[in-house]
Amino acid sequence: MKILIAGFKGDDNSAKILLDHIKKICNEDILYLENDFEISSKQIEEKLLENYDNVLIFGQKPNTTNIYFENNAILEGKKLVTDYYYGALKENLEQYAYQVMNSYDAGKYLCNNVFFRALNFKQENNLKSKIAFIHIPTIDNIEDMNHLLSSIKDYIENLYEEEK
């Protein structure tokens, strides 16, 4: 099992802060995405060539305490849908008392762009990676980052258990 965990840079970006924490306790590959359309697209495409089984991309969503699973990305009128199965992750997060929502709008900015580029690159190169995009609240709307970290860590451990 090979897992990539990605998120956008930024000292106050909750995705970056979550990745910093994950990096300390897990051995997964971590990718800090630049806050730039072209650079982040190239970064994710280069990493996808390493044939990950699962790719978890995190972004932050303002004005909410909920966690959102993005099911598709739309760019220039083209819609791409992920084949990532969110069910086990949803159950895991709900066990930690998080409200989890399915979303069909990854936004109009960097999150949607990198998700679209990843899905498109997967499709064009016939890759097997399962790609997820997860929007988490901004840092001021996360009550306890360690609690969120524990839920993500448990989920990753479960992925490895399922593989056995």
Predicted regions and their residues:
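N-terminal catalytic or cofactor-binding beta/alpha core of small enzyme domains
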Residues: 1-108, 118-131, 146-163
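A generic structural motif
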Residues: 137-142
